[in-house]
């Protein structure tokens, strides 16, 4: 009986000792280094924002840097039941193509709008890789404002490219498609 009491007492003392040894000496020890450099307090703004293509999800993600916080996932080329994207009368027509309703695509590259060659933060453009489409996402609302289908194009992988005042969004293609001169230019 005495042995069990001594063993229990030693076990409790060991646990208390371990718990005390794990505490930092002061609170500043726990928050120095690289983690502190990336910390952005609640209510404060990140210095940069990263607009990341979602690939096969067809969505655009917005992250704050340096915090790494995910601020929003914007549906672009795919339906999103959570946000109603692609289901209501306002957004469903945006997913129509000349081949019918295409409720999915591979959002690949993004490009920011520019004024005098400087990024102005009005819009983000993104290309669809599977169908020849480019989307314009409005950065005032963080919603897809427009999707256009590109004539004479297939496999729109490498674009969009923006002119210095965003007058034109230029698309690159991997496959040639015969020209359709009757439709002409597509304004943004």
Please state what every model-predicted region is:
Residues 18-21:
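C-terminal motif of bacterial Sec signal peptides marking the signal peptidase cleavage site
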Residues 23-25:
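Bacterial signal peptide processing site
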Residues 36-48, 109-112, 121, 171-188:
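Short, conserved, GDST-rich strand-edge loop motifs in beta-rich repeat architectures
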Residues 37-39, 82-87, 103-115, 152-162:
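Repeated scaffold domains used in trafficking and secretory/extracellular systems
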Residues 49-52, 123-126, 168-170:
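Conserved beta-propeller blade signature
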Residues 57-58, 131-132, 175-179:
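Short glycine/acidic-enriched loop and turn motifs that connect beta-strands
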Residues 59-95, 126-151:
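Beta-propeller domains
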Residues 139-188:
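Asp-box/WD-like beta-propeller blade repeats and closely related beta-sheet repeat scaffolds
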């Amino acid at each position: 009986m005495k042995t069990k009491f001594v063993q229990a007492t030693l076990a409790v003392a060991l646990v208390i000792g371990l718990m005390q040894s794990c505490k930092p000496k002061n609170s500043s020890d726990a928050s120095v280094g690289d983690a502190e450099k990336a910390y952005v307090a609640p209510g404060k703004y990140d210095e940069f924002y990263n607009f990341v293509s979602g690939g096969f999800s067809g969505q655009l993600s917005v992250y704050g840097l340096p915090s790494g916080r995910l601020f929003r996932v914007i549906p672009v080329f795919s339906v999103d039941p959570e946000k109603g994207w692609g289901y209501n009368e306002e957004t469903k027509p945006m997913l129509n193509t000349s081949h019918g309703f295409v409720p999915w695509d591979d959002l690949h590259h993004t490009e920011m709008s520019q004024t005098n060659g400087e990024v102005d933060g009005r819009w983000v453009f993104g290309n669809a890789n599977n169908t020849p489409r480019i989307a314009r996402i409005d950065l005032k609302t963080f919603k897809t404002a427009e999707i256009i289908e590109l004539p004479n194009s297939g496999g729109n992988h490498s674009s969009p490219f923006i002119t210095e005042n965003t007058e034109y969004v230029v698309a690159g293609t991997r496959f040639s498609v015969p020209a359709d001169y009757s439709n002409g230019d597509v304004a943004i």
